[in-house]
Amino acid sequence: MFISGRRTADKWRAEERLQCPAGSARAALARCADGGAVGPFKCVFVGEMAAQVGAVRVVRAVAAQEEPDKEGKEKPHAGVSPRGVKRQRRSSSGGSQEKRGRPSQEPPLAPPHRRRRSRQHPGPLPPTNAAPTVPGPVEPLLLPPPPPPSLAPAGPAVAAPLPAPSTSALFTFSPLTVSAAGPKHKGHKERHKHHHHRGPDGDPSSCGTDLKHKDKQENGERTGGVPLIKAPKRETPDENGKTQRADDFVLKKIKKKKKKKHREDMRGRRLKMYNKEVQTVCAGLTRISKEILTQGQINSTSGLNKESFRYLKDEQLCRLNLGMQEYRVPQGVQTPFMTHQEHSIRRNFLKTGTKFSNFIHEEHQSNGGALVLHAYMDELSFLSPMEMERFSEEFLALTFSENEKNAAYYALAIVHGAAAYLPDFLDYFAFNFPNTPVKMEILGKKDIETTTISNFHTQVNRTYCCGTYRAGPMRQISLVGAVDEEVGDYFPEFLDMLEESPFLKMTLPWGTLSSLRLQCRSQSDDGPIMWVRPGEQMIPTADMPKSPFKRRRSMNEIKNLQYLPRTSEPREVLFEDRTRAHADHVGQGFDWQSTAAVGVLKAVQFGEWSDQPRITKDVICFHAEDFTDVVQRLQLDLHEPPVSQCVQWVDEAKLNQMRREGIRYARIQLCDNDIYFIPRNVIHQFKTVSAVCSLAWHIRLKQYHPVVEATQNTESNSNMDCGLTGKRELEVDSQCVRIKTESEEACTEIQLLTTASSSFPPASELNLQQDQKTQPIPVLKVESRLDSDQQHNLQEHSTTSV
């Protein structure tokens, strides 16, 4: 068996020598050594491999002699080299072939299906013990074994293509270029220096030092000193077949990170400056001293900006109270942002001929035809406190002014941003008066739950998001004390804060423009009241809160079994936050009388603040002169409460129809911190756009209720106390003045109250407050807090004359 295997190998080797030239003997020998015998038969060829060393040396000598002839030919350029030059011979030749002939020192040669090895620089081969080199300066060119004589082309030698290996990936090599004497391009050196090399054993680090030595000799640039030793950098092939080094990725990432970080650093440092004309001395930007302002001269050599100087002169004139012509808004003042509608409103001044005409703006709505009066607190900030009071008097006089038909000229008047000094209403009462009882509706239900304002504040805070909250609205509470079924309490500190505004001080139910003379603010039957609305929104059925009360089951079982297709609409419920058209009034029955109303709006924020005030209400107001037509068209029941006076909602289609019939209206959007005034006989409807806490009250103006009528009301109230028996004492409260006297002294005090032109008694008798003594027409309202039996006696003597 052993002999037959050996004969078979000898026979195969003889056939290979006949078919292949001497140049391909080593390839055949390699195939015979590795594939010709398996297992114990492999040792037979070890001795025969040594016999082939001489033939290999002859082949290498012949290749070295043919190289000068090939180099003498015309060489192509680096970028236009033929494809055969790019592919280089395998590393299974030369010294590795000779090493294979010594089995005691080196392992046998790897099979021919391994990767090809690329040699980038055609420098001299490193000296070896077994392979003698041909003397001479000529560098041997490594060529692949030539093909058989029948298939060899006449042109230059081209490497024979090998079958693609099954276990290793293909590599794409850069074109082989011969380095010329002289300096090279930096990119060329980088490409050769960082190229991937492998040794004869497949280890990329085995030939690293030799290649570095070659670079040093070829370039000729680093002849002295220690050569720089750098580890070969790794290359990663991309999907297009191109190679990219790992350091390129790192550099790209660093550049991207630096750019991004630079943007983030510069993002928050931009100063908000709108114009050079609004930069004041306080900002340190104009560099204008006070001496220059007083002299009124500009030095041309100082390089001052004329526009900045003009603005500062105008600003100084604004604060000097110099008169009507000089009192104006500085020409350089520009608001940060305003809508087109607001810009058109501010551009229209109301020519009243007074000192404050530039601060009053009149809007004539083109769609509805009604007039609206506007004032802006950012413009009024230039006014002093005394001038603010005078402006508020003039503004309110225009607001409630009427024509010969007793119809107001303006459908609405707004002071934008006038309530900015007040705290958030809901936060104020939740933290200062947490146990105040309130009535809270369940969202989307008709149930009412009684809770504390602190608990309501917690629910709003938990469900608030982006301007709305998903909890039930809070019904109105009284801020001047609860009567009968009302909810609320008396909050004198909060009322004092309201009176700090000159607009509210005159228009509160006990204000200077009111016809009522209340000795105590808790006696007011006209408010103020406060309520909170969540804003109109669509609520998914899954988010709808469940009622705490049990519902009765429907008696009709067929309705429960009926199938209603959903089509494409989601299952959600519209929560309407609307107050239909109504007219504010006082009195009941024959005493019904329309009156004016005042409101203050504070948006529910919970930490979401913005530069622009948020829109809270969408309001439609009809002109007071069209009061009768609107009542007939909308079928209002004026004797009902405001919530139930009208059964239909007035939308755009209805407004257009009413406008064609000659009815005028105004459509306004009220924002956070706005104070609005509605004259009498103005029918209006509200829609809550976002979560808002509102204050509102009625005011009985003096022009609506003459002094004679107020005096008669005071006489009737005094008549009620005339018939009371029993002893009454004089008590003075911090807020209220209660007049309690003996029955014998009642007639004298009634005469005092009914006679407006009589002299006022000294303060020592009635212990009146100082501000009441200075009033020109003192009218005192007698307050009686009686028991049930005393109230019965009061009704019996109500018809008694004075």
UniProtKB/Swiss-Prot annotation:
Its main location: nucleus. Residues 152-170 have a biased composition (Low complexity). The modification Phosphoserine is found at residue 81. Residues 65-244 are annotated as: Disordered. It is found in: Nucleus. A motif (Nuclear localization signal) lies at residues 252-263. One of its GO terms (molecular function) is metal ion binding. Its EC number is 1.14.11.-. Residues 123-151 have a biased composition (Pro residues). Signal peptide: none annotated. Belongs to the round spermatid basic protein 1 family. This is Lysine-specific demethylase 9. The lineage of its organism: Eukaryota, Metazoa, Chordata, Craniata, Vertebrata.
